[in-house]
Design a protein with these regions (language model features):
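Conserved phosphate-binding elements of NTP-dependent enzyme cores
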Residues: 1-221
Length: 221
């Protein structure tokens, strides 16, 4: 590891397995990083859609549902949901893709649907356009997906859409999504979490929600 500063002789952290910094720095550096991908929801949804009859009939695999590299991504914007316009004498302007209207997916992806226990059918592009609160209702019988979305809701992020670009999130939103991801992971030992001003800019109700989540982290070790 790195050499200790001269004024530090020794660091003892007996029983501590990990130290993790959860700050307000931006998540991701480009538009391909979304709330669903960072919260580990999108990969699970791709597997679920690959098991549907619609996908099997068309011989699509989980990888085909990736908007980054899959066969079902929009052929015009290559899954970014936007295109750049060359404006003379001015910086390029990014606008929603005219082919997929910003959904990132090609037309066939909209035809492959998952049917929940309520008999409602949704395509993956439809789910990605939903906010967390709405997606919770649509995926109530998908245990792992529902659990991860529920954590986002409990952190006061139910208004975010699954397809929202993470670089565009505020510092407070980014920090809470990082917390949600930690809560969704299986515990692998005692962990110290270092948070950088986690309540800055939060409403009192959201501060209360955050405090409850921190108590849960503490209880998990």
């Amino acid at each position: 590891g790195e050499r200790l500063p001269k004024h530090v002789k020794n660091i003892s952290a007996e029983g501590i397995s990990h130290v993790k910094l959860i700050d307000a720095s931006p998540i991701g550096i480009n538009v391909r990083s979304t709330v669903a991908t960072y919260a580990n929801v999108h990969d699970e949804l791709r597997k679920i859609y690959a098991r549907t009859a619609d996908a099997k009939n068309r011989k699509y695999k989980a990888g085909d549902f990736s908007y980054n590299t899959g066969k079902l991504r929009c052929p015009v914007c290559d899954g970014t949901g936007q295109i750049s316009l060359d404006v003379q004498f001015l910086p390029d302007v990014d606008v929603p893709c005219p082919e997929c209207s910003g959904s990132r997916y090609g037309k066939e992806a909209w035809q492959i649907c998952y049917e929940n226990k309520q008999g409602e059918r949704y395509s993956l592009p439809q789910l990605m356009e939903m906010d967390v609160n709405t997606a919770l209702l649509a995926t109530s019988d998908l245990k792992l997906v529902h659990q991860r979305l529920q954590v986002l809701k409990e952190l006061g992020l139910g208004y975010l859409t699954l397809g929202e670009e993470t670089p565009s999130l505020s510092g407070g939103e980014a920090q809470r999504i990082k917390l949600a991801t930690e809560l969704s992971r299986r515990s692998t030992g005692k962990t110290i979490y270092i948070l950088d001003e986690p309540t800055t800019g939060l409403h009192f109700a959201d501060v209360h929600k955050l405090t409850e989540i921190l108590h849960r982290l503490s209880a998990d070790g």
